[in-house]
Curated annotation (Swiss-Prot):
Organism: Rhodococcus erythropolis (strain PR4 / NBRC 100887)
Keywords: Endonuclease, Hydrolase, Nuclease, RNA-binding, tRNA processing
Any one of the GO BP annotations: tRNA 5'-leader removal
One annotated Gene Ontology cellular component of this protein: ribonuclease P complex
Subunit structure, as described in the record: Consists of a catalytic RNA component (M1 or rnpB) and a protein subunit.
Keyword Nucleus part of the UniProt annotation: no
Gene3D superfamilies xrefs: 3.30.230.10
GO MF entries: 3'-tRNA processing endoribonuclease activity; ribonuclease P activity; tRNA binding
Protein name as annotated: Ribonuclease P protein component
NCBIfam families associated with the record: rnpA
Primary gene name: rnpA
Lineage, uppermost ranks: Bacteria, Bacillati, Actinomycetota, Actinomycetes, Mycobacteriales
Length: 126
């Protein structure tokens, strides 16, 4: 599960990431990313990336939307240590996300983050 400090909660944070951040579209997802270091007032103390989800009614009824959101939260938890700190990432699910597998959603998210150069290389320590 995605840790609490790694979640975007405030509407203002979502708005900044979507409006002022970069965007990368995939078949079932749109990934928005905003570097908080660009605006000093937005630098928070948790020293890690934050993730937010947008799953609209276009994805399906409530049961399907919540299923998609749970799967995306689980996928985001795997990327917490891989995404550069001080980054806000908003993932907007498109209608195809309802039928896509978790592996496919993870692949699309990784592809979007890689295209935006947000993944940091994780060095193996002995």
């Amino acid at each position: 599960m995605l840790p609490e400090p790694s979640r975007l909660r405030r509407h203002a944070d979502f708005s900044v990431a979507v409006r002022r951040g970069r965007r990368m579209g995939r078949r079932d997802l749109v990934v928005h990313a905003f570097d908080r270091e660009q605006v000093e007032a937005l630098v928070v103390t948790n020293h890690g990336p934050r993730f937010g989800l947008i799953v609209s009614k276009a994805v399906g009824p409530a049961v399907i939307r919540h299923r998609v959101a749970r799967r995306l939260r689980h996928i985001c938890a795997d990327f917490v240590g891989q995404v550069s700190p001080e980054t806000d990432v908003v993932i907007r699910a498109l209608p195809g996300a309802a039928t896509a597998s978790s592996a496919e959603l993870a692949k699309q998210l990784r592809g979007g983050l890689t295209k935006m150069n947000l993944l940091v290389s994780v060095s193996e320590e002995p």
